[in-house]
Amino acid sequence: MTKYTFKPKDFKAFNVEGLDARMEALNEYIRPQLRELGEYFSDFFTSQTGETFYPHVAKHARRSVNPPKDTWVAFATNKRGYKMLPHFQIGMFEDQLFVMFGIMHEAKDKATRAKVFERKFKAIQQLPDDYRVCLDHMKPDKPFIKDLTDDDLIEAIQRAINVKKGEFFIARAITPQDKRLKSDKAFIAFLEETFDQFLPFYSA
């Protein structure tokens, strides 16, 4: 019995038709692990940064018709919410598990906070080849950093700084069949390795 990881069939919760039925599927197949990951990595980030982190499992409370296409647990230093702060995420779409750190368009002082990515531009480029960027958290698209030109990357960061709807996340994503989801030990190791790469951007 696994505690933290997800099986390929768990991702099929996103195929369930209808809001209520899909929410039931998320509650059964995905949320228990997100809650456990929330506890584990809140302690991890608190230990790594010296700041108290809180987990925020997506509630999808505003939805009244359309079922969610993704779900997640986010980590931030505010107990009441995470969207206003730079934050870490573990989440899922139907075809991927993703891990991210960055800034949403709703963040306070977004222009100032997003400049960390400008200052750490070289560090972004030096991330391992399977690291990506996400420029819209509502979409599954996450191009590999290695496939972007310098100008592409600069433009993406500038958009997060200067455009109201702009966002910027560094990310990693794996498929539901990935071997790193086969056991809790492998999954936690993958997540810790990823967050170790993200943390210098948080503390910068």
Swiss-Prot record:
This protein's name: UPF0637 protein SAOUHSC_01054
One Pfam match: DUF1054
Family: Belongs to the UPF0637 family.
Gene3D superfamilies in UniProt: Protein of unknown function DUF1054
Membrane-crossing segments per the record: none
Species this protein is from: Staphylococcus aureus (strain NCTC 8325 / PS 47)
Domain of life: Bacteria
